[in-house]
Amino acid sequence: MSSETISVSKLMNRKVQTDFEDQNIMSACNIMHANDIGSVIIVTRNEDRTPVGIITERDIVRVLGKLNPDLLNTPLKTLMSSPLITLEESASMTDASKLMNIKKIRRLVVVDRNNKMTGILTQNDIFRAIDKNPNLFSEFYGESFSSKFKEIYEKYNQYRLENLMPEFNKYRLED
């Protein structure tokens, strides 16, 4: 299995949290807090609820950093990151990762062929996929890095066994 064959639709979260572009930052903060997430997709109030932007934790920090109380009531449309960067759900994990790196973003809105939002893909989704499939690690980070990492990890485990475990065993309660 390679990152070229893993489609974005397999990794993305289909439960996208949204808010309307005329809402304020407190509304978006409440959604993020209630759902333990780092972003909210901003949509229009029309029937299609068209995604038009994204509010992220960084955007909120930027607003709060200005210490201007009026910004708390400013419509999200004014504060959101736009234009929204999207990727078709048939794209590969590699495509998604490259686009995130090029655009210097951590989240992508996933759309179908009709440009309708179907989910959201985050860097964490990609990291989870790599974690579940060790072969992807070397694909993303290079074979030499992977072998060096493995070597370091094995040495660390050996060090733990030789140095830390005997020390730990001194304090172990006898049965």
Stretch-by-stretch model annotation:
Residues 1-14, 56-88, 92-102, 113, ...:
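Tandem CBS (Bateman) regulatory domains
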Residues 15-18, 50-51, 86, 116:
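Short, flexible active-site loop motifs that bind/organize anionic cofactors or intermediates
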Residues 32-35, 40-59, 100, 108-124:
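A glycine-centered beta-loop-beta connector
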Residues 18-37, 42-44, 87-104, 111, ...:
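The conserved cystathionine-beta-synthase
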